[in-house]
């Protein structure tokens, strides 16, 4: 099955006319995108883009052989240009199947938002799933085939990856997307980050995007985004490090969020911060409040998000009496070193996908107290040792993630 992406952008395209935002200002060349439309084997057209005949011609294709045009957008969506010579576009009712003279079988997929998704099966059995912007499949309740998703994993999925990362998480949870599925981001709007940051965020989700006019063959080998198993995200206070860490896992199901800060009775500010974090996280994530990280790292299971090492270190230093100079000299330093070594070894040996958050505190004002300087030094050492065990290390500054490794 051969796909030509006549457009990969949102319905309004990218850049949007007269929009001064950074994404629109930098959407030039390959980053400029028309409304998403996909030509399948020259015979099936999924959605319409402005000037589809011209878009196809620029890609070295023709729409003269199109036998079916399917619309996925909501009925009250933007008006579409309908060129002469094409079959009248239709929407297939949810759950209905359609056989096309070209040999393709099409099934309409019910969604959790207005619009229609389409599962397309070629004569040789290759399967793709196409979803409209802002939508996820409805009824994905568990892994394996069922009436809502027969046939096992898809060979290719095209969806709004950054707009609905939970849609990709649901598909992964149901076994409809696996490591062999080619995940393509489409419907890209001006709320996506500009330039290389877009491709970095997509790679972290196990997805990619291609320029308008690209032709792909379903099942062909391609460079699958390398998903790091262990990632350390560093940053200062309010730098956006936790948001970045959450973003790296929001397209994966059943994440366990490990909060090392615990509860602080009577601290309204702390309670507000915790509530904000919980609101931001996907509803499918679970939360554990603990500083006992080694058993979690040693166990098999879904991805872990550990937030954060600085609070873990505070608790560890409390337990060994590190704030008192005499206790520190009388075995406290050695006890802390042993606990740090145990944690670092657990990060090295963990079978799980792990994203670890930590503060970067060594670049600011020198702490006024000996205990403050001790904490700064120990956190710097801890960050260095954990970074040494991670495939990917990021530094977040002003909400921008800089790749260190």
Per-segment meaning from a language model:
Residues 9, 235-299:
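Conserved P-loop
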Residues 1-61, 94-149, 212-225:
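Core dinuclear metal-dependent hydrolase active-site scaffold
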Residues 137-223:
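Cap/insert and terminal regions of metallo-dependent hydrolase folds
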Residues 43-94, 151-157:
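Active-site metal-binding motif and surrounding structural segment of the metallo-beta-lactamase
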Residues 137-140, 145-146, 164-176, 243-250, ...:
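A short, acidic, amphipathic alpha-helical segment used as a generic capping/interface helix at domain edges
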Residues 61-65, 82-86, 148-153, 171-180, ...:
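Short, conserved loop/helix-junction motifs that constitute active-site signature segments
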Residues 225-231, 236:
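Pre-Walker A (Motif I) flank of P-loop NTPase domains
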């Amino acid at each position: 099955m051969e796909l030509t992406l006549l457009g990969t952008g949102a319905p309004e395209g990218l850049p949007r006319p007269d929009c001064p935002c950074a994404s629109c200002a930098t959407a030039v060349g390959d980053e400029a995108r028309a409304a998403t439309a996909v030509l399948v084997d020259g015979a099936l057209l999924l959605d319409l883009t402005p000037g589809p005949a011209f878009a196809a011609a620029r890609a070295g294709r023709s729409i003269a052989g199109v036998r079916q045009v399917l619309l996925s957008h909501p009925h009250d969506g933007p008006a579409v240009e309908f060129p002469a010579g094409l079959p009248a576009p239709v929407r297939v009712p949810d759950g209905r199947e359609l056989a096309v003279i070209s040999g393709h079988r099409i099934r309409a997929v019910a969604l959790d938002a207005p619009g229609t998704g389409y599962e397309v099966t070629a004569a040789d059995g290759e399967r793709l799933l196409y979803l409209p912007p802002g939508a996820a499949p409805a009824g994905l309740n568990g892994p394996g085939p069922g009436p809502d998703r027969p046939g096992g994993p898809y060979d290719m999925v095209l969806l709004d990856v950054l707009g609905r990362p939970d849609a990709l998480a649901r598909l992964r949870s149901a076994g409809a997307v696996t490591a062999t599925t080619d995940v393509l981001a489409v419907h890209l709007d001006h709320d996506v980050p500009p330039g290389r940051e877009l491709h970095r965020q997509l790679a972290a989700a196990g997805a990619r995007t291609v320029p308008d006019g690209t032709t792909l063959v379903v099942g062909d080998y391609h460079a699958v985004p390398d998903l790091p198993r262990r990632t350390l995200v560093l940053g200062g206070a309010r730098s956006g490090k936790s948001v970045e860490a959450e973003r790296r896992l929001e397209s994966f199901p059943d994440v366990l969020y490990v909060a090392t800060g615990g509860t602080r009775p009577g601290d309204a500010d702390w309670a507000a911060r915790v509530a904000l974090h919980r609101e931001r996280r996907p509803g499918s994530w679970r939360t554990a409040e603990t500083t006992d990280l080694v058993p979690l790292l040693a166990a098999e299971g879904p991805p872990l998000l550990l937030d954060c090492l600085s609070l873990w270190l505070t608790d560890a230093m409390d337990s060994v009496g590190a704030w008192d100079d005499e206790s520190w000299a009388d075995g406290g330093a050695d006890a802390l070193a042993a606990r740090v070594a145990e944690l670092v070894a657990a990060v090295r040996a963990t079978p799980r996908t792990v994203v670890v958050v930590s503060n970067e505190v060594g670049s600011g004002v020198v702490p006024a107290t000996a205990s403050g300087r001790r904490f700064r030094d120990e956190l710097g050492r801890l960050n260095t040792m954990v970074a040494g065990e991670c495939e990917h290390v990021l530094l977040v500054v002003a909400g921008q993630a800089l790749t260190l490794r």
